[in-house]
C-alpha cells in the first residue's frame, strides 16, 4: 500500500513525513496555483522535504497530446523521476501512449468512471486516479467506482494501480483501501484527521495522572 499527501505545502510535508510512512507527494495545477510557487521552485522543495525519497507527481497543462508530451518533458527536466499526471481525455489517452513509448511514467487523472480509468491503464498509465468525493458529489458512488476499477485492473491491466484521490473524510479513504485500492493520496486536513482523536489524548492524560499519583513523576 502506498500513502501520499496531496499538497504543495512544503512545511506540512516536512512535518508529516516525520510521522507518516509516506510514499510521496501528489500535486495538481490547482494545488500548485494555491501555493503561488512555480513548479521549478516548489517541486525541488517538496523533494527535499521528503529527504530526497519518495515519488513526486505533477500535472500537464496542455490540452493536445503533443503539448502534453512537451509538458511532461519539462516536468522531467525539473525532477528526473517525476510521475506525470495526464487528464484522461481523448488527447490524454494519446499522450499516455506516447509517453509510455518514451519511458515516462504517467498517472491517468480526472477519472470519473471505471471504464475511463481502465482505458488509461491499457494506454500505459502506471497509476489511475479516480476522484472519489467528486464522483459522490455528482450523484455517483466513488467507492463503487474504485471497487470496479480495481477489479478491472486486476483482470486486464495488472501492471497499473488505483491511486484514489479527492477525499473529504478518513472514512472514504479507508473504504477505498477495504475495496482493494493499492494507493491513496490525502489532502492535509484528512491526513490530520487520521491522527487526531480527542479520546486518545484523554487516555494518555489519564495514564500520566495515575502514574504521577502513584510515583510522583511522569517518567518511567
Swiss-Prot record:
The reaction(s) this protein catalyses: beta-D-fructose 6-phosphate = dihydroxyacetone + D-glyceraldehyde 3-phosphate
Signal peptide: none
Gene name in the database record: fsaA
Gene3D superfamilies, A to Z: Aldolase class I
CDD domains per the UniProt record, alphabetical: Transaldolase_FSA
Protein name: Fructose-6-phosphate aldolase 1
Location within or outside the cell: Cytoplasm
Primary localisation category: cytoplasm
Pfam family, one: TAL_FSA
Subunit: Homodecamer.
Residues annotated as catalytic: 85
GO cellular component assignments: cytoplasm
GO biological process, alphabetically ordered: fructose metabolic process
This protein's UniProt keywords: Carbohydrate metabolism, Cytoplasm, Lyase, Schiff base
EC supergroup of this enzyme: lyase
